[in-house]
Amino acid sequence: MIVDNSKDFDLKSFLANLTTHSGVYRMLDKHGEIIYVGKAKNLKNRVNSYFSKGAKDSKTLMMVEQIARIEITITPSDYEAYLLENNLIKQHRPKYNILFKDDKSYPYLVISRDKFPRVSFYRGKSAYKKGQCFGPYVSISSVKNTLNTIQKIFPIRQCENSYYKSRVRPCLQYQIKRCLAPCVGLVSQQQYDEQLAILKKFLAGKFSSVLEEISAKMYQASEDMEYEKAQVYRDQLVVLRKLQQQQIVDIQEDKTFDVIGIYMQDSYASIALLQIQNGDVVADRHWSIDAKGQDKTSIMHAFLSHFYLGDEIRNIWPKNIILSKVEFADITDLMNSISQKIGQAINWIIAPAADNLKWLKLAEVNARQKLNIYTSSKSQYQKRLESLKEFLELEKDIKRIECFDISHFQGEATIASCVVYTDDGEDRKSHRRYNIKGIKSGDDYAAIHQAVSRRVSSGLEADNLPDVMIIDGGKGQIHQAEAVFREYGIQDKVQLVSLGKGVERISGKEKIYKGFDDTEYTLDEHNPGFLLLRQVRDSAHDHAIKGQRKKVSANRQSSIIEEIEGVGSKRRKALLRYFGGWQELSRASVDEIAKVKGISKKLAQEIWECFH
Protein backbone atom coordinates (compact mmCIF):
# COMPACT_ATOMS: atom_id res chain seq x y z
CA MET A 1 0.00 0.00 0.00
CA ILE A 2 1.15 3.57 -0.66
CA VAL A 3 1.16 5.28 2.71
CA ASP A 4 1.31 8.94 1.74
CA ASN A 5 -1.02 10.45 -0.82
CA SER A 6 -1.46 13.97 0.55
CA LYS A 7 -0.63 17.06 -1.46
CA ASP A 8 0.89 18.93 1.50
CA PHE A 9 3.85 16.83 2.54
CA ASP A 10 5.10 17.25 6.12
CA LEU A 11 8.57 15.68 6.14
CA LYS A 12 9.10 15.89 9.90
CA SER A 13 5.78 14.20 10.67
CA PHE A 14 6.33 11.64 7.91
CA LEU A 15 9.74 10.59 9.26
CA ALA A 16 8.45 10.36 12.83
CA ASN A 17 5.56 8.08 11.88
CA LEU A 18 7.36 5.79 9.45
CA THR A 19 6.84 2.04 9.81
CA THR A 20 9.64 -0.35 10.76
CA HIS A 21 8.42 -2.93 8.21
CA SER A 22 10.36 -3.87 5.09
CA GLY A 23 9.43 -2.12 1.87
CA VAL A 24 10.34 0.27 -0.91
CA TYR A 25 10.68 4.06 -0.72
CA ARG A 26 10.49 6.58 -3.56
CA MET A 27 11.99 10.08 -3.42
CA LEU A 28 10.13 12.67 -5.54
CA ASP A 29 11.17 16.20 -6.52
CA LYS A 30 8.98 19.31 -6.67
CA HIS A 31 7.75 18.32 -10.15
CA GLY A 32 6.50 14.98 -8.88
CA GLU A 33 9.21 13.02 -10.70
CA ILE A 34 10.78 10.03 -8.96
CA ILE A 35 14.48 10.79 -8.49
CA TYR A 36 15.45 7.77 -6.40
CA VAL A 37 14.06 4.33 -5.50
CA GLY A 38 15.40 2.22 -2.64
CA LYS A 39 14.45 -0.76 -0.49
CA ALA A 40 14.90 -1.38 3.20
CA LYS A 41 14.42 -4.09 5.80
CA ASN A 42 13.45 -1.31 8.19
CA LEU A 43 11.90 1.65 6.36
CA LYS A 44 12.00 3.97 9.37
CA ASN A 45 15.73 3.55 9.96
CA ARG A 46 16.71 3.66 6.30
CA VAL A 47 14.71 6.72 5.24
CA ASN A 48 15.64 8.67 8.38
CA SER A 49 19.33 8.02 7.68
CA TYR A 50 19.18 10.39 4.69
CA PHE A 51 18.26 13.30 6.97
CA SER A 52 20.45 12.50 9.97
CA LYS A 53 23.80 14.12 10.63
CA GLY A 54 26.86 12.29 9.38
CA ALA A 55 29.18 11.96 6.41
CA LYS A 56 27.45 11.68 3.06
CA ASP A 57 28.82 11.79 -0.47
CA SER A 58 28.10 14.82 -2.66
CA LYS A 59 25.64 12.92 -4.85
CA THR A 60 23.49 11.94 -1.86
CA LEU A 61 23.58 15.49 -0.47
CA MET A 62 22.47 16.86 -3.84
CA MET A 63 19.61 14.34 -3.99
CA VAL A 64 18.40 15.12 -0.47
CA GLU A 65 18.22 18.83 -1.33
CA GLN A 66 15.80 18.01 -4.17
CA ILE A 67 13.43 15.78 -2.17
CA ALA A 68 9.98 17.35 -1.97
CA ARG A 69 8.04 14.24 -1.12
CA ILE A 70 8.54 10.59 -0.14
CA GLU A 71 6.26 7.65 -0.86
CA ILE A 72 6.62 4.16 0.54
CA THR A 73 5.22 0.73 -0.26
CA ILE A 74 5.20 -1.90 2.48
CA THR A 75 6.01 -5.42 1.26
CA PRO A 76 5.37 -8.82 2.90
CA SER A 77 9.07 -9.70 2.86
CA ASP A 78 12.53 -8.48 1.98
CA TYR A 79 12.39 -10.60 -1.18
CA GLU A 80 9.26 -8.82 -2.47
CA ALA A 81 10.94 -5.51 -1.66
CA TYR A 82 13.90 -6.39 -3.89
CA LEU A 83 11.61 -7.35 -6.76
CA LEU A 84 9.50 -4.19 -6.47
CA GLU A 85 12.59 -1.98 -6.21
CA ASN A 86 14.06 -3.54 -9.33
CA ASN A 87 10.82 -3.12 -11.31
CA LEU A 88 10.36 0.51 -10.23
CA ILE A 89 13.95 1.39 -11.19
CA LYS A 90 13.44 -0.12 -14.64
CA GLN A 91 10.08 1.60 -15.05
CA HIS A 92 11.04 5.11 -13.91
CA ARG A 93 14.86 5.15 -14.38
CA PRO A 94 15.41 7.64 -11.52
CA LYS A 95 18.42 9.88 -12.07
CA TYR A 96 20.07 9.11 -8.70
CA ASN A 97 19.86 5.32 -9.02
CA ILE A 98 22.60 3.28 -10.64
CA LEU A 99 21.21 2.57 -14.11
CA PHE A 100 22.50 -0.27 -16.26
CA LYS A 101 22.28 -0.03 -20.02
CA ASP A 102 23.00 -3.42 -21.56
CA ASP A 103 25.18 -3.28 -24.66
CA LYS A 104 22.65 -5.16 -26.78
CA SER A 105 19.29 -6.87 -26.84
CA TYR A 106 19.72 -10.63 -26.86
CA PRO A 107 17.75 -13.10 -28.99
CA TYR A 108 15.61 -15.95 -27.68
CA LEU A 109 14.15 -19.09 -29.19
CA VAL A 110 10.36 -19.00 -28.89
CA ILE A 111 7.84 -21.82 -29.17
CA SER A 112 4.50 -20.24 -30.08
CA ARG A 113 1.13 -20.92 -28.45
CA ASP A 114 -0.54 -22.16 -31.66
CA LYS A 115 -2.35 -25.50 -31.88
CA PHE A 116 0.63 -26.75 -33.90
CA PRO A 117 3.33 -24.44 -32.49
CA ARG A 118 6.18 -23.04 -34.54
CA VAL A 119 9.72 -22.50 -33.31
CA SER A 120 11.37 -19.19 -34.19
CA PHE A 121 13.70 -16.59 -32.74
CA TYR A 122 12.82 -13.20 -31.31
CA ARG A 123 15.08 -10.41 -30.11
CA GLY A 124 14.14 -8.52 -26.96
CA LYS A 125 12.80 -8.96 -23.45
CA SER A 126 9.18 -9.06 -24.60
CA ALA A 127 9.84 -12.46 -26.18
CA TYR A 128 7.82 -14.16 -23.43
CA LYS A 129 4.66 -12.55 -24.87
CA LYS A 130 5.15 -14.59 -28.04
CA GLY A 131 5.24 -17.99 -26.33
CA GLN A 132 7.55 -20.22 -24.29
CA CYS A 133 11.09 -18.84 -24.40
CA PHE A 134 14.55 -20.37 -24.28
CA GLY A 135 17.75 -18.34 -24.00
CA PRO A 136 19.05 -15.74 -24.18
CA TYR A 137 21.56 -16.63 -26.89
CA VAL A 138 24.84 -14.81 -27.40
CA SER A 139 24.12 -13.55 -30.92
CA ILE A 140 21.76 -13.77 -33.88
CA SER A 141 24.17 -16.17 -35.60
CA SER A 142 24.19 -18.53 -32.60
CA VAL A 143 20.40 -18.64 -32.38
CA LYS A 144 20.13 -19.20 -36.16
CA ASN A 145 22.63 -22.05 -35.93
CA THR A 146 20.54 -23.54 -33.14
CA LEU A 147 17.39 -23.24 -35.27
CA ASN A 148 19.16 -24.96 -38.14
CA THR A 149 20.27 -27.78 -35.82
CA ILE A 150 16.75 -28.12 -34.43
CA GLN A 151 15.35 -28.50 -37.95
CA LYS A 152 17.71 -31.40 -38.61
CA ILE A 153 16.57 -33.23 -35.47
CA PHE A 154 13.01 -32.15 -34.69
CA PRO A 155 10.53 -31.77 -37.59
CA ILE A 156 8.68 -28.85 -35.99
CA ARG A 157 7.40 -26.10 -38.28
CA GLN A 158 9.27 -22.79 -38.44
CA CYS A 159 7.09 -20.98 -40.99
CA GLU A 160 5.09 -17.81 -40.35
CA ASN A 161 1.39 -18.27 -39.57
CA SER A 162 0.35 -16.46 -42.77
CA TYR A 163 2.34 -18.98 -44.83
CA TYR A 164 1.17 -21.93 -42.71
CA LYS A 165 -2.54 -21.12 -43.04
CA SER A 166 -2.41 -20.70 -46.82
CA ARG A 167 -0.94 -24.14 -47.60
CA VAL A 168 -2.88 -26.63 -49.71
CA ARG A 169 0.03 -29.02 -50.15
CA PRO A 170 3.25 -29.76 -48.21
CA CYS A 171 6.20 -27.46 -48.81
CA LEU A 172 9.84 -28.33 -49.48
CA GLN A 173 10.60 -28.69 -45.74
CA TYR A 174 8.31 -31.72 -45.62
CA GLN A 175 9.98 -33.27 -48.67
CA ILE A 176 13.42 -33.10 -47.00
CA LYS A 177 11.99 -34.41 -43.71
CA ARG A 178 12.38 -31.18 -41.74
CA CYS A 179 8.68 -30.65 -41.05
CA LEU A 180 5.73 -32.94 -40.33
CA ALA A 181 3.37 -30.83 -42.49
CA PRO A 182 0.66 -30.12 -39.90
CA CYS A 183 -0.57 -27.44 -42.33
CA VAL A 184 -2.21 -30.09 -44.51
CA GLY A 185 -3.03 -32.63 -41.79
CA LEU A 186 -0.23 -35.14 -42.42
CA VAL A 187 0.50 -35.52 -38.70
CA SER A 188 -1.77 -36.07 -35.72
CA GLN A 189 -1.89 -33.70 -32.77
CA GLN A 190 -0.46 -36.44 -30.52
CA GLN A 191 2.53 -37.17 -32.78
CA TYR A 192 3.32 -33.47 -33.14
CA ASP A 193 3.04 -32.86 -29.40
CA GLU A 194 5.42 -35.77 -28.71
CA GLN A 195 8.12 -34.19 -30.88
CA LEU A 196 7.43 -30.80 -29.32
CA ALA A 197 7.82 -32.17 -25.78
CA ILE A 198 11.21 -33.69 -26.65
CA LEU A 199 12.31 -30.41 -28.27
CA LYS A 200 11.43 -28.47 -25.11
CA LYS A 201 13.53 -30.85 -23.00
CA PHE A 202 16.39 -30.44 -25.45
CA LEU A 203 16.24 -26.63 -25.26
CA ALA A 204 16.00 -26.76 -21.46
CA GLY A 205 19.35 -28.56 -21.37
CA LYS A 206 18.05 -32.03 -20.44
CA PHE A 207 20.25 -33.67 -23.03
CA SER A 208 20.65 -37.07 -21.37
CA SER A 209 16.91 -37.32 -20.79
CA VAL A 210 16.27 -36.57 -24.48
CA LEU A 211 18.67 -39.29 -25.60
CA GLU A 212 17.07 -41.84 -23.28
CA GLU A 213 13.54 -40.93 -24.36
CA ILE A 214 14.25 -41.08 -28.10
CA SER A 215 16.16 -44.34 -27.67
CA ALA A 216 13.22 -45.89 -25.79
CA LYS A 217 10.77 -44.70 -28.46
CA MET A 218 12.96 -46.17 -31.19
CA TYR A 219 13.03 -49.61 -29.56
CA GLN A 220 9.30 -49.47 -28.85
CA ALA A 221 8.51 -48.57 -32.46
CA SER A 222 10.75 -51.40 -33.65
CA GLU A 223 8.98 -53.90 -31.38
CA ASP A 224 5.63 -52.67 -32.69
CA MET A 225 6.98 -53.21 -36.23
CA GLU A 226 6.55 -49.48 -37.00
CA TYR A 227 9.85 -49.43 -38.85
CA GLU A 228 9.44 -46.05 -40.54
CA LYS A 229 8.84 -44.40 -37.18
CA ALA A 230 11.79 -46.29 -35.68
CA GLN A 231 13.99 -45.00 -38.50
CA VAL A 232 12.96 -41.41 -37.73
CA TYR A 233 13.99 -41.88 -34.08
CA ARG A 234 17.23 -43.55 -35.15
CA ASP A 235 18.12 -40.59 -37.39
CA GLN A 236 17.43 -38.23 -34.49
CA LEU A 237 19.75 -40.23 -32.23
CA VAL A 238 22.56 -40.15 -34.80
CA VAL A 239 22.49 -36.34 -34.98
CA LEU A 240 22.09 -35.93 -31.23
CA ARG A 241 25.07 -38.13 -30.44
CA LYS A 242 27.21 -36.13 -32.83
CA LEU A 243 26.21 -33.07 -30.85
CA GLN A 244 27.24 -34.52 -27.50
CA GLN A 245 30.71 -33.05 -27.77
CA GLN A 246 29.49 -29.65 -28.96
CA GLN A 247 26.00 -29.39 -27.51
CA ILE A 248 24.16 -26.10 -27.70
CA VAL A 249 22.91 -26.03 -24.14
CA ASP A 250 24.73 -27.23 -21.07
CA ILE A 251 23.78 -30.71 -19.82
CA GLN A 252 25.78 -30.61 -16.61
CA GLU A 253 24.39 -27.68 -14.71
CA ASP A 254 26.89 -28.00 -11.84
CA LYS A 255 29.60 -26.96 -14.32
CA THR A 256 27.88 -23.72 -15.23
CA PHE A 257 28.94 -20.57 -13.44
CA ASP A 258 28.88 -16.81 -13.87
CA VAL A 259 31.87 -14.56 -13.24
CA ILE A 260 31.28 -10.87 -12.46
CA GLY A 261 34.19 -8.47 -12.59
CA ILE A 262 34.08 -4.74 -11.79
CA TYR A 263 36.60 -2.10 -12.75
CA MET A 264 36.32 1.50 -11.52
CA GLN A 265 38.06 4.63 -12.74
CA ASP A 266 37.28 8.22 -11.79
CA SER A 267 33.47 8.53 -11.75
CA TYR A 268 32.80 5.57 -14.03
CA ALA A 269 32.53 1.82 -13.55
CA SER A 270 32.37 -1.14 -15.89
CA ILE A 271 30.88 -4.55 -15.14
CA ALA A 272 31.87 -7.62 -17.15
CA LEU A 273 29.82 -10.81 -16.90
CA LEU A 274 31.31 -14.05 -18.23
CA GLN A 275 29.01 -17.06 -18.49
CA ILE A 276 30.97 -20.32 -18.36
CA GLN A 277 29.76 -23.75 -19.45
CA ASN A 278 32.01 -26.82 -19.33
CA GLY A 279 35.13 -24.68 -19.11
CA ASP A 280 34.22 -22.47 -22.09
CA VAL A 281 33.09 -18.84 -22.18
CA VAL A 282 29.73 -19.09 -23.94
CA ALA A 283 28.72 -15.45 -23.42
CA ASP A 284 30.26 -12.19 -22.27
CA ARG A 285 28.25 -9.07 -21.54
CA HIS A 286 29.23 -5.60 -20.42
CA TRP A 287 27.69 -2.59 -18.73
CA SER A 288 29.31 0.83 -18.26
CA ILE A 289 27.78 3.27 -15.80
CA ASP A 290 28.18 6.62 -14.12
CA ALA A 291 29.37 5.58 -10.65
CA LYS A 292 29.94 8.97 -9.03
CA GLY A 293 29.65 8.64 -5.25
CA GLN A 294 29.38 4.83 -5.38
CA ASP A 295 31.72 2.13 -4.11
CA LYS A 296 32.28 -1.37 -5.51
CA THR A 297 29.87 -3.01 -3.05
CA SER A 298 26.95 -0.68 -3.88
CA ILE A 299 27.55 -1.17 -7.60
CA MET A 300 27.67 -4.96 -7.20
CA HIS A 301 24.49 -4.84 -5.11
CA ALA A 302 22.67 -2.83 -7.79
CA PHE A 303 23.95 -5.07 -10.58
CA LEU A 304 22.98 -8.35 -8.91
CA SER A 305 19.47 -7.01 -8.35
CA HIS A 306 19.24 -5.72 -11.92
CA PHE A 307 20.50 -8.88 -13.59
CA TYR A 308 19.25 -11.75 -11.43
CA LEU A 309 15.99 -10.29 -10.11
CA GLY A 310 15.02 -8.69 -13.42
CA ASP A 311 12.57 -10.02 -16.00
CA GLU A 312 15.10 -11.51 -18.42
CA ILE A 313 14.13 -15.06 -19.34
CA ARG A 314 16.64 -17.82 -18.67
CA ASN A 315 16.34 -21.60 -18.56
CA ILE A 316 19.63 -22.58 -16.91
CA TRP A 317 20.85 -20.87 -13.76
CA PRO A 318 24.45 -21.09 -12.54
CA LYS A 319 25.24 -23.15 -9.46
CA ASN A 320 28.24 -20.90 -8.75
CA ILE A 321 28.73 -17.14 -9.07
CA ILE A 322 32.22 -15.66 -8.73
CA LEU A 323 32.35 -11.99 -7.71
CA SER A 324 34.88 -9.22 -7.43
CA LYS A 325 35.74 -8.66 -3.77
CA VAL A 326 32.95 -6.79 -1.97
CA GLU A 327 31.63 -6.44 1.56
CA PHE A 328 29.85 -9.79 1.89
CA ALA A 329 27.59 -8.77 4.79
CA ASP A 330 26.09 -5.92 2.74
CA ILE A 331 24.73 -8.21 0.03
CA THR A 332 23.78 -11.34 2.01
CA ASP A 333 20.05 -10.53 2.02
CA LEU A 334 20.12 -9.91 -1.73
CA MET A 335 21.86 -13.25 -2.32
CA ASN A 336 19.13 -15.02 -0.36
CA SER A 337 16.44 -13.27 -2.41
CA ILE A 338 18.09 -14.37 -5.67
CA SER A 339 18.23 -17.99 -4.46
CA GLN A 340 14.57 -17.72 -3.45
CA LYS A 341 13.57 -16.46 -6.90
CA ILE A 342 15.31 -19.21 -8.86
CA GLY A 343 14.43 -21.95 -6.39
CA GLN A 344 17.95 -23.28 -5.85
CA ALA A 345 20.97 -22.62 -3.68
CA ILE A 346 23.85 -20.69 -5.24
CA ASN A 347 27.47 -20.96 -4.17
CA TRP A 348 28.69 -17.36 -3.98
CA ILE A 349 32.48 -17.16 -4.34
CA ILE A 350 33.80 -13.78 -3.18
CA ALA A 351 37.39 -14.77 -2.38
CA PRO A 352 38.23 -17.06 -5.32
CA ALA A 353 41.43 -19.08 -5.60
CA ALA A 354 43.18 -21.21 -8.24
CA ASP A 355 41.11 -21.54 -11.47
CA ASN A 356 38.26 -19.45 -10.07
CA LEU A 357 40.68 -16.59 -9.48
CA LYS A 358 41.88 -16.85 -13.10
CA TRP A 359 38.29 -16.53 -14.31
CA LEU A 360 37.74 -13.47 -12.09
CA LYS A 361 40.93 -11.80 -13.35
CA LEU A 362 39.79 -12.43 -16.92
CA ALA A 363 36.42 -10.77 -16.17
CA GLU A 364 38.14 -7.78 -14.53
CA VAL A 365 40.51 -7.38 -17.51
CA ASN A 366 37.45 -7.38 -19.80
CA ALA A 367 35.77 -4.78 -17.59
CA ARG A 368 38.85 -2.55 -17.67
CA GLN A 369 39.18 -2.72 -21.45
CA LYS A 370 35.50 -1.94 -21.95
CA LEU A 371 35.70 1.01 -19.57
CA ASN A 372 38.72 2.43 -21.40
CA ILE A 373 36.79 2.27 -24.67
CA TYR A 374 33.65 3.70 -23.03
CA THR A 375 35.37 6.68 -21.36
CA SER A 376 37.37 7.52 -24.48
CA SER A 377 34.26 7.43 -26.67
CA LYS A 378 32.17 9.34 -24.11
CA SER A 379 34.82 12.04 -23.74
CA GLN A 380 35.00 12.55 -27.50
CA TYR A 381 31.21 12.65 -27.80
CA GLN A 382 30.90 15.21 -24.97
CA LYS A 383 33.44 17.45 -26.72
CA ARG A 384 31.35 17.29 -29.88
CA LEU A 385 28.17 18.12 -27.96
CA GLU A 386 29.83 21.09 -26.27
CA SER A 387 31.19 22.34 -29.60
CA LEU A 388 27.75 22.09 -31.23
CA LYS A 389 26.17 23.92 -28.29
CA GLU A 390 28.72 26.71 -28.73
CA PHE A 391 28.12 26.98 -32.49
CA LEU A 392 24.33 27.09 -32.05
CA GLU A 393 24.73 29.61 -29.20
CA LEU A 394 22.52 27.62 -26.84
CA GLU A 395 22.28 28.46 -23.15
CA LYS A 396 21.34 24.98 -21.93
CA ASP A 397 23.20 21.72 -22.48
CA ILE A 398 21.98 19.56 -25.36
CA LYS A 399 20.10 16.54 -24.02
CA ARG A 400 18.36 15.30 -27.18
CA ILE A 401 19.01 15.67 -30.91
CA GLU A 402 16.75 14.42 -33.70
CA CYS A 403 17.52 14.34 -37.40
CA PHE A 404 15.19 13.85 -40.38
CA ASP A 405 16.08 12.49 -43.80
CA ILE A 406 13.91 11.59 -46.80
CA SER A 407 14.46 8.62 -49.10
CA HIS A 408 12.48 7.37 -52.10
CA PHE A 409 12.90 5.16 -55.16
CA GLN A 410 12.27 7.07 -58.38
CA GLY A 411 9.77 9.22 -56.52
CA GLU A 412 7.88 6.26 -55.03
CA ALA A 413 7.96 4.41 -51.68
CA THR A 414 8.85 7.62 -49.83
CA ILE A 415 10.20 7.16 -46.31
CA ALA A 416 11.16 9.77 -43.70
CA SER A 417 13.60 8.61 -41.05
CA CYS A 418 14.06 10.19 -37.65
CA VAL A 419 17.13 9.22 -35.62
CA VAL A 420 17.72 10.19 -32.01
CA TYR A 421 20.91 11.08 -30.14
CA THR A 422 20.95 11.94 -26.44
CA ASP A 423 23.73 13.22 -24.20
CA ASP A 424 24.75 9.54 -23.84
CA GLY A 425 25.07 8.95 -27.60
CA GLU A 426 22.91 7.29 -30.24
CA ASP A 427 19.57 6.01 -28.93
CA ARG A 428 18.68 3.34 -31.48
CA LYS A 429 15.54 2.26 -29.64
CA SER A 430 14.02 5.70 -30.23
CA HIS A 431 14.70 5.77 -33.99
CA ARG A 432 11.60 5.63 -36.14
CA ARG A 433 10.40 5.88 -39.73
CA TYR A 434 7.38 7.63 -41.25
CA ASN A 435 5.59 6.33 -44.33
CA ILE A 436 4.86 9.46 -46.35
CA LYS A 437 1.49 9.52 -48.12
CA GLY A 438 -0.64 11.93 -50.12
CA ILE A 439 2.19 13.91 -51.76
CA LYS A 440 3.35 14.33 -55.35
CA SER A 441 5.97 11.89 -56.58
CA GLY A 442 9.47 12.93 -55.45
CA ASP A 443 8.32 16.02 -53.51
CA ASP A 444 10.97 16.10 -50.75
CA TYR A 445 9.71 19.43 -49.42
CA ALA A 446 6.21 18.08 -48.80
CA ALA A 447 7.70 14.93 -47.27
CA ILE A 448 9.78 16.96 -44.79
CA HIS A 449 6.75 19.11 -43.93
CA GLN A 450 4.60 16.03 -43.26
CA ALA A 451 7.22 14.17 -41.20
CA VAL A 452 8.19 17.16 -39.05
CA SER A 453 4.54 18.07 -38.52
CA ARG A 454 3.73 14.55 -37.29
CA ARG A 455 6.76 14.54 -34.98
CA VAL A 456 6.07 17.98 -33.49
CA SER A 457 2.41 17.13 -32.93
CA SER A 458 3.25 13.94 -31.04
CA GLY A 459 6.15 15.65 -29.24
CA LEU A 460 3.95 18.40 -27.84
CA GLU A 461 1.44 15.82 -26.66
CA ALA A 462 4.10 13.62 -25.02
CA ASP A 463 6.25 16.58 -23.89
CA ASN A 464 9.39 15.08 -25.44
CA LEU A 465 10.48 17.54 -28.11
CA PRO A 466 14.23 17.55 -28.83
CA ASP A 467 16.60 20.38 -27.99
CA VAL A 468 17.99 20.34 -31.53
CA MET A 469 16.28 19.20 -34.74
CA ILE A 470 18.48 18.61 -37.79
CA ILE A 471 17.08 18.51 -41.32
CA ASP A 472 19.11 16.83 -44.06
CA GLY A 473 18.96 19.37 -46.88
CA GLY A 474 19.37 23.02 -47.72
CA LYS A 475 17.27 26.16 -47.54
CA GLY A 476 14.18 24.62 -49.13
CA GLN A 477 14.01 21.79 -46.60
CA ILE A 478 14.62 23.97 -43.55
CA HIS A 479 11.96 26.45 -44.72
CA GLN A 480 9.42 23.61 -44.64
CA ALA A 481 10.40 22.79 -41.06
CA GLU A 482 10.23 26.49 -40.14
CA ALA A 483 6.66 26.62 -41.42
CA VAL A 484 5.74 23.72 -39.12
CA PHE A 485 7.47 25.40 -36.16
CA ARG A 486 5.47 28.61 -36.77
CA GLU A 487 2.25 26.64 -37.07
CA TYR A 488 2.80 25.06 -33.64
CA GLY A 489 4.52 28.07 -32.07
CA ILE A 490 7.72 26.29 -31.03
CA GLN A 491 10.29 28.63 -32.61
CA ASP A 492 11.89 29.25 -29.20
CA LYS A 493 11.57 25.70 -27.88
CA VAL A 494 13.65 23.73 -30.41
CA GLN A 495 16.81 24.82 -32.22
CA LEU A 496 16.38 24.06 -35.91
CA VAL A 497 19.39 23.44 -38.15
CA SER A 498 19.94 21.95 -41.61
CA LEU A 499 22.92 20.46 -43.35
CA GLY A 500 23.12 20.68 -47.15
CA LYS A 501 25.91 19.48 -49.44
CA GLY A 502 25.57 22.48 -51.72
CA VAL A 503 26.70 22.63 -55.36
CA GLU A 504 29.99 20.77 -54.76
CA ARG A 505 28.24 17.92 -52.91
CA ILE A 506 31.49 17.05 -51.11
CA SER A 507 31.39 15.55 -47.62
CA GLY A 508 33.04 17.95 -45.20
CA LYS A 509 32.10 21.00 -47.29
CA GLU A 510 28.42 21.11 -46.32
CA LYS A 511 26.53 24.37 -45.88
CA ILE A 512 24.83 24.87 -42.51
CA TYR A 513 21.61 26.83 -41.97
CA LYS A 514 20.09 27.75 -38.62
CA GLY A 515 16.34 27.99 -38.25
CA PHE A 516 14.87 31.45 -38.93
CA ASP A 517 18.32 32.72 -39.94
CA ASP A 518 19.15 33.22 -43.65
CA THR A 519 22.90 33.24 -43.02
CA GLU A 520 24.87 30.42 -44.65
CA TYR A 521 27.44 28.97 -42.24
CA THR A 522 30.50 26.80 -42.83
CA LEU A 523 32.75 25.09 -40.30
CA ASP A 524 36.15 23.48 -40.56
CA GLU A 525 35.68 19.83 -41.51
CA HIS A 526 37.49 18.77 -38.30
CA ASN A 527 35.38 20.95 -36.01
CA PRO A 528 33.91 18.63 -33.29
CA GLY A 529 30.43 20.15 -33.55
CA PHE A 530 30.47 19.82 -37.33
CA LEU A 531 31.58 16.19 -37.01
CA LEU A 532 28.59 15.53 -34.75
CA LEU A 533 26.18 17.14 -37.22
CA ARG A 534 27.54 14.92 -39.99
CA GLN A 535 27.52 11.84 -37.77
CA VAL A 536 23.84 12.29 -36.91
CA ARG A 537 22.94 13.20 -40.52
CA ASP A 538 24.70 10.07 -41.87
CA SER A 539 22.89 7.91 -39.32
CA ALA A 540 19.53 9.35 -40.45
CA HIS A 541 20.45 8.75 -44.09
CA ASP A 542 21.36 5.09 -43.45
CA HIS A 543 18.17 4.58 -41.45
CA ALA A 544 16.07 6.06 -44.27
CA ILE A 545 17.77 4.00 -46.99
CA LYS A 546 17.21 0.73 -45.09
CA GLY A 547 13.54 1.51 -44.59
CA GLN A 548 13.04 2.57 -48.17
CA ARG A 549 14.69 -0.60 -49.53
CA LYS A 550 12.40 -2.76 -47.40
CA LYS A 551 9.37 -0.90 -48.70
CA VAL A 552 10.48 -1.18 -52.34
CA SER A 553 11.21 -4.89 -51.92
CA ALA A 554 7.75 -5.50 -50.48
CA ASN A 555 6.10 -3.50 -53.27
CA ARG A 556 8.06 -5.34 -55.95
CA GLN A 557 7.13 -8.77 -54.65
CA SER A 558 3.44 -7.94 -54.69
CA SER A 559 3.55 -6.28 -58.13
CA ILE A 560 5.75 -8.68 -60.09
CA ILE A 561 2.79 -10.91 -61.01
CA GLU A 562 0.49 -7.94 -61.66
CA GLU A 563 2.68 -6.99 -64.64
CA ILE A 564 1.70 -10.20 -66.47
CA GLU A 565 -1.29 -9.77 -68.75
CA GLY A 566 -4.07 -12.15 -67.76
CA VAL A 567 -3.15 -12.37 -64.07
CA GLY A 568 -5.67 -10.42 -62.05
CA SER A 569 -6.38 -10.35 -58.33
CA LYS A 570 -8.26 -13.68 -58.34
CA ARG A 571 -5.50 -15.61 -60.11
CA ARG A 572 -2.87 -13.90 -57.96
CA LYS A 573 -4.68 -15.02 -54.81
CA ALA A 574 -5.04 -18.54 -56.23
CA LEU A 575 -1.29 -18.71 -56.88
CA LEU A 576 -0.44 -17.49 -53.39
CA ARG A 577 -2.96 -19.83 -51.79
CA TYR A 578 -1.55 -22.82 -53.69
CA PHE A 579 2.16 -22.11 -53.19
CA GLY A 580 1.98 -20.22 -49.91
CA GLY A 581 4.23 -17.34 -50.94
CA TRP A 582 6.34 -15.70 -53.66
CA GLN A 583 9.44 -17.68 -52.73
CA GLU A 584 7.77 -21.06 -53.26
CA LEU A 585 6.19 -19.81 -56.49
CA SER A 586 9.57 -18.68 -57.81
CA ARG A 587 10.95 -22.21 -57.26
CA ALA A 588 8.05 -23.99 -58.97
CA SER A 589 8.28 -25.53 -62.45
CA VAL A 590 5.97 -24.64 -65.34
CA ASP A 591 4.05 -27.90 -64.86
CA GLU A 592 3.55 -27.21 -61.15
CA ILE A 593 2.30 -23.66 -61.82
CA ALA A 594 -0.12 -25.01 -64.43
CA LYS A 595 -1.76 -27.19 -61.76
CA VAL A 596 -3.26 -24.07 -60.16
CA LYS A 597 -6.92 -23.64 -61.04
CA GLY A 598 -7.37 -21.02 -63.78
CA ILE A 599 -3.71 -21.08 -64.93
CA SER A 600 -3.11 -22.39 -68.45
CA LYS A 601 0.18 -23.92 -69.62
CA LYS A 602 0.92 -20.79 -71.65
CA LEU A 603 0.23 -18.48 -68.69
CA ALA A 604 2.27 -20.74 -66.42
CA GLN A 605 5.21 -20.34 -68.82
CA GLU A 606 4.91 -16.53 -68.64
CA ILE A 607 4.78 -16.62 -64.84
CA TRP A 608 7.83 -18.91 -64.72
CA GLU A 609 9.78 -16.57 -67.04
CA CYS A 610 8.95 -13.70 -64.68
CA PHE A 611 11.18 -15.28 -62.04
CA HIS A 612 13.94 -16.66 -64.28
From Swiss-Prot:
Which InterPro entries does its entry note?
A: GIY-YIG_endonuc, GIY-YIG_endonuc_sf, GIY-YIG_UvrC_Cho, RuvA_2-like, UVR_dom, UVR_dom_sf, UvrABC_protein_C, UvrC
The UVR domain is annotated at 208-243
What highest taxon heads this organism's lineage? Bacteria
Q: Which SMART domains match?
A: GIYc
Can you say where in the cell this protein is located? Cytoplasm
Q: Where is the GIY-YIG domain?
A: 20-98
Keyword tags: Cytoplasm, DNA damage, DNA excision, DNA repair, Excision nuclease, SOS response
What Pfam family is a match, any one?
UvrC_RNaseH
A single Gene Ontology biological process assigned to it is: nucleotide-excision repair
> Mind telling me which Gene3D superfamilies this protein's record contains?
5' to 3' exonuclease, C-terminal subdomain (1.10.150.20), GIY-YIG endonuclease (3.40.1440.10), UVR domain (4.10.860.10), UvrC, RNAse H endonuclease domain (3.30.420.340)
One of the record's GO molecular function terms: DNA binding
Entries under CDD domains matching the protein:
GIY-YIG_UvrC_Cho
Q: What GO CC terms are in its UniProt record?
A: cytoplasm; excinuclease repair complex
HAMAP family xref list: UvrC
Quaternary state and interactors: Interacts with UvrB in an incision complex.
Q: What does this protein do?
A: The UvrABC repair system catalyzes the recognition and processing of DNA lesions. UvrC both incises the 5' and 3' sides of the lesion. The N-terminal half is responsible for the 3' incision and the C-terminal half is responsible for the 5' incision.
Q: Which family does it belong to?
A: Belongs to the UvrC family.
Q: What is this protein called?
A: UvrABC system protein C
Q: State the organism of origin.
A: Francisella tularensis subsp. mediasiatica (strain FSC147)
Q: Gene that codes for this?
A: uvrC
